[in-house]
């Protein structure tokens, strides 16, 4: 099944929502290890309370989950062999980019080369899939 540009854009948005929120979630959840309770059940409840009471965590979490919802909805009409590579590969790229913007050490030239190669591979994958839909009649 070939993909439309709309489906591809939805998958790229999923990757941005997943990958772009990871550094924010990591930063907002720092200090969680300081929560200490006697039982695992109370520990879990206190950790949930600490996370969901923190808007710096809650906003990226909700954006991340909206990416999951969009992914689920997009999978109904998109080939899985296209959706998985786009979302998972580009999510890593978005994580690195947002991490760099936030001042994290993402690695050196090797990380940049990896991002370029990933984007190149995904571009080939997308172009191949979308070009199959060009000129084909719609079967609606």
UniProtKB/Swiss-Prot annotation:
> Keywords on this record?
Membrane, Transmembrane, Transmembrane helix
User: Membrane spanning segments where?
Assistant: 1-21, 82-102, 111-131
Q: How does it sit in the membrane?
A: Multi-pass membrane protein
**GO cellular component terms, A-Z:** membrane
Organism superkingdom: Eukaryota
Q: What is its main location?
A: membrane
Locations listed in the record: Membrane
Q: Which family does it belong to?
A: Belongs to the TMEM234 family.
Q: What is this protein called?
A: Transmembrane protein 234
Instruction: Give the classification, highest ranks.
Output: Eukaryota, Metazoa, Chordata, Craniata, Vertebrata
Q: Which gene encodes it?
A: Tmem234
